[in-house]
Amino acid sequence: NFGENAGHGNLLALSPYVHPYDFSSEGAFYNMMSYYFRFAQKKKLLNDSTIVILPEYLGTWLVAVNEKKALYKDTSVTDAMQRIALSNIWSFGWAYLNAKGKNKAEDAVFRMKAAKMLAAYQHTFTRLAKEFGVTIVAGSIVLPQPEVKDGVIVLHNGGKLYNVSAVFDRNGK
């Protein structure tokens, strides 16, 4: 905690301590994130001028959303990515055929999971922004050619993968 409250708003950088299970579902991700927001609220660090900044790649780990429980016990990212591919072999195979990156397997996993990742990311940060009345610079997420249309993020699955971060205003847009 640095600085003093001058009543003009503040930047609040949160770096949550996460477990693999925190990315197991949209609900688990929301619960983990809301814990930190409630803590900040309790400490009177949030007001309608607060901008909450979250770390790079936070949303990228949503690649694990809705996977088998064994995945959350894997000890390496490589093992987890292989398990995701094998658990979704047909979807992975199709995505692999359309992969564009240097690492086709990794590219395929992110393309295959993009819609579910985005749903959990967008719903969670929209909800948190509205609930706590703050602007959120959400942690980054790897998605195929994302674009904001009418206040929501949309994907272009044939496009390149980008590591992006979205800003959600106090109204969740």
Language model regions located:
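Hydrophobic structural segments
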Residues: 1-173
